[in-house]
Amino acid sequence: MGDQMLGMVTAHDYSASHDSALNKKYVEEFKKANNFRPNFVSVGGYDGMHLIYEALKKTGGKTDGDTLLAAMKGMRWESPRGMMSIDPETRDIVQPIYIRRVEKLNGELWNTEFAKFDDVKDPLKVKK
């Protein structure tokens, strides 16, 4: 898209520029394996696999749906995108949302975070 994107402000749940040790390692390993930066799709896959793995550990390897869902309710973990959890009532993901600005760093465009909303739930399911 080019330099015309510089300064654009967006809100999203992930940027490869997220400043955490886990994300830096994730970006490094992902780029090594794929020759491009990770994005929200790849980190979603990472989180999904992490959630399944941890749920299987909690269930002792039981794989039926009800047992796995029960194990996932209320789980909390550190993701490359920040602290994540599963709402025990709705079973939806609870995640940070970042306000980002497009900036050029080392000749590349990046979404750089400058504000954050923690523990954002699906607004259509939040009780009023």
What are the functions of these language-model segments?
Residues 1-128:
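Extracytosolic ligand-binding ectodomains
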